[in-house]
């Protein structure tokens, strides 16, 4: 993945010299996807490293280190982004309203969280993307438990938390979670729970 980040750096330098700042020209890579692939009906399973939390952790850490480089210079080479935090492994068709409410603590800590923890602690990933789905009733991008208690307090993550595309709007949209009445309350909940960017 070092070659990928070298190319991204070169591409960014070229577009910056042209004063162009469009999509796919920046230095944030929305990868790796370290969700656990448990159900073959999940259409995005091919983006993951499989069903094994340990293997997913090892692969994810290497991707992050390859993309971000050694971090020994004045500037970051680029930012890798661990996604989709957390408990997101399908179903794809209702991901904007799905509530992962039957996850036992042991399954959470032994299956779903280890890859993210490894990327934060070992890989020093710069960004984490919160998922569309809910966890225990709260949208992941508005979950104090996930974003503040686990990610920031337990693991010491001090990077950027960004939402998946449009995930904050899912807090109040009719086809979403309907946990908040409007955009203002949804945005406030996301920020107060630890989401930095939409």
Question: Where do the PLM segments sit?
Answer:
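Glycoside hydrolase catalytic-domain context in secreted enzymes
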Residues: 1-198
